[in-house]
Design a protein with these regions (language model features):
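Metal- or metallocofactor-binding catalytic centers and their adjacent structured scaffolds
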Residues: 33-38, 67-140
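Conserved, mostly hydrophobic/aromatic
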Residues: 65, 71, 128, 141, ...
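Metal-dependent enolase-superfamily TIM-barrel catalytic cores that perform enediolate-based chemistry
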Residues: 146-264
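Generic enzyme active-site microenvironment
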Residues: 187, 215-216, 245-246, 270-272, ...
Length: 404
């Protein structure tokens, strides 16, 4: 029997789901019987602007998500939107209505299937899965990273990110990094403009000194080149100015990544875009593309594959970066625990009290903390360890919606 394109895509997604499902990412009988009872959304507006080579975010809308299953609550966070202070979170979150009444095991399978069949994107799937896996650990009374057999526990350096075009404004952010003792690893957003990028590099290297690992992310912003030698020369100029590494300098094929890394030698390239989503990156990963590889929140889609990808990067003797999606709240500790459990080189997904303190005001328990410039396990709690003061959160949030 012939399948039309839609039927084939659906069948392929279900085949992938059945192929890559695994015991440690599944539910025991105990939690399989627990059901999704309610979902609540809390919107937090962040008005600190963020500058990229592709656009400027003047404000952004974060949604803290609580999924309730019996007496257990799972917490997550989504960067839901940008530049709309009146964003409709009920409309945005309506896709979560599909989970109403589902057993936890079925809800996890549903989210994975939706992503693998390309019906949900990673920004929809990941927050739902994080909250559901949080519930799994809480029902089992075990940390979820233990259920996932992620056994490393060494603290991981936190990466402070500076997103400013203006050197003086960048130096203001650099002082915040210094005040927070987050200077061992610093990331600069770059813009594909040699003059601006060199000025930022020189100023920040001078500010932080020689001991800081200074990396940059151009978001594929270097476009004015015809031969890789030209792009390599720009990377080497940045290295001479004090830069250690560059994430996604330009739109590159796998072969171009490999050739460029060979041309720039001890200057480290960090592929990010080629690592998205995790289930595809498992096949596309080539260790010769860079010295470090980024697992970026909101782009992996599914976490069994993200963990496999992280282990594959480490097994190839390459550095592992856990990135960020401008997160400010409950998602940060999840990514920090993933970074610690995998033995990452650094983690960018750290709390940002200088941009919003709502999370810090409302969280009552969590498993990680930032100390001496590193994220470390403070006390491993069931699930991902998040507990929130919901009365205070409801009061501080810009919007609150209970979907059901």
């Amino acid at each position: 029997m012939e399948l039309n394109r839609r039927q084939f895509t659906g069948s392929l997604g279900m085949l992938m789901l059945s192929t890559i499902s695994g015991n440690i990412f599944s539910c025991s009988t105990k939690e399989a019987n627990s059901k999704v009872d309610s979902i609540s959304l809390y919107m937090v507006n962040v008005t600190k602007s963020r500058n990229f080579s592709h656009s400027t975010w003047h404000n952004r809308q974060h949604v803290f998500i609580k999924i309730q299953a019996g007496r257990h609550a799972g917490w997550a966070e989504a960067l839901a939107n940008k530049n709309d202070l009146d964003f409709d979170i009920a409309k945005w979150g309506s896709y979560l209505n599909e989970l109403n009444g589902m057993p936890i095991a079925k809800a996890i399978e549903h989210c994975r299937s939706k992503f693998l069949q390309k019906k949900w994107n990673a920004k929809m799937t990941e927050p739902a899965l994080i909250a559901l896996y949080d519930i799994v650990g809480k029902i089992e009374n075990k940390p979820t990273i233990e259920l996932w057999e992620l056994n490393k526990r060494e603290p991981v350096p936190g990466l402070f990110c500076i997103l400013e075009k203006n050197v003086d404004q960048a130096l203001v952010q650099a002082q915040i990094a210094k005040d927070q003792n987050l200077t061992s690893h610093v990331k600069i957003k770059m813009f594909g403009d040699v003059e601006i990028d060199l000025a930022l590099t020189v100023a920040l290297r001078q500010f932080f000194g020689e001991d800081s690992f200074l990396m940059a992310d151009a978001n594929r912003g270097y476009k004015k080149w015809e031969r890789l030698d030209e792009l390599a020369l720009r990377m080497k100029d940045l290295q001479k100015a004090g830069l250690n590494a560059m994430e996604d300098p330009a739109e590159l094929t796998t072969e171009q990544w490999i050739e460029l890394q060979n041309k720039v030698g001890d200057f480290s390239l960090i592929p990010d875009r080629p690592m998205r989503p995790a289930h595809k990156a498992l096949d596309l990963f080539n260790q010769d593309m860079g010295h470090y590889f980024n697992i970026h929140p909101d782009t992996m889609g599914t976490f069994k594959e993200a963990v496999k990808l992280g282990k594959k990067i480490k097994a190839a003797d390459r550095g592992l970066m856990i990135g960020d999606s401008s997160l400010i709240g409950p998602a940060c500790t999840f990514w920090q625990q993933l970074a610690i459990g995998l033995g990452a080189s650094w983690v960018e997904a750290i709390e940002k009290p200088q941009e919003s303190n709502v999370f810090q005001e409302c969280v009552t328990n969590m498993s990680t903390k930032i100390a001496n410039g590193k994220t470390e396990i403070s006390a491993l709690r069931p699930g991902f360890g998040i507990e929130m003061d919901e009365v205070k959160l409801k009061a501080l949030a810009d919007k609150y919606v209970k979907l059901y």
